[in-house]
């Protein structure tokens, strides 16, 4: 049975990648062995597909702000509803903000494990600029950064 302890094992056993992956249909997002491990172990291939669907907004934000680092967060409630959000840190005028949302999507059902007795369980991934030419971003687990 897959529990949140399985998730902790995934995050704990991935510290870097010897191999990089991408979807055949989208060259601007690469991802690490840790993200592949997350997808395979939790049968959560939809996570990368969702991030790909957000990449237009990420690239637009990158071009406007030159910010090269984003956080992808998935929040899962006990009733399995939740959200997926991409955000970054940065300045708006002269004011610094540690949470500038790029895109936020409510998701009616998320099949990821939750922490017992926690109202919401969050999963974090990092999305970092990998190449300028061609423009590519890398999705990775925090333990791989």
What kind of region is each of these model predictions?
Residues 1-110:
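N-terminal "domain-start" segment
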Residues 94-145:
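Short, compact, well-ordered microdomains
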């Amino acid at each position: 049975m897959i529990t949140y302890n399985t998730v902790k094992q995934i995050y704990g056993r991935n510290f870097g990648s010897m191999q990089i992956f991408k979807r055949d249909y989208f060259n601007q997002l690469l991802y690490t062995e840790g993200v592949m491990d997350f997808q395979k172990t939790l049968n959560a291939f939809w996570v990368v597909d969702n991030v790909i669907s957000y990449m237009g907004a990420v690239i637009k934000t990158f071009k406007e702000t030159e910010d090269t680092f984003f956080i992808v967060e998935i929040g899962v409630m006990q009733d399995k509803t939740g959200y997926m959000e991409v955000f970054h840190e940065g300045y708006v005028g002269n004011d610094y903000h540690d949470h500038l949302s790029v895109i936020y999507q409510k998701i009616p059902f998320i099949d990821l494990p939750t922490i017992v007795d926690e109202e919401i369980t969050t999963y974090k991934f990092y999305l970092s600029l990998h190449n300028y030419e061609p423009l590519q971003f890398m999705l990775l687990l925090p333990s791989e950064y």
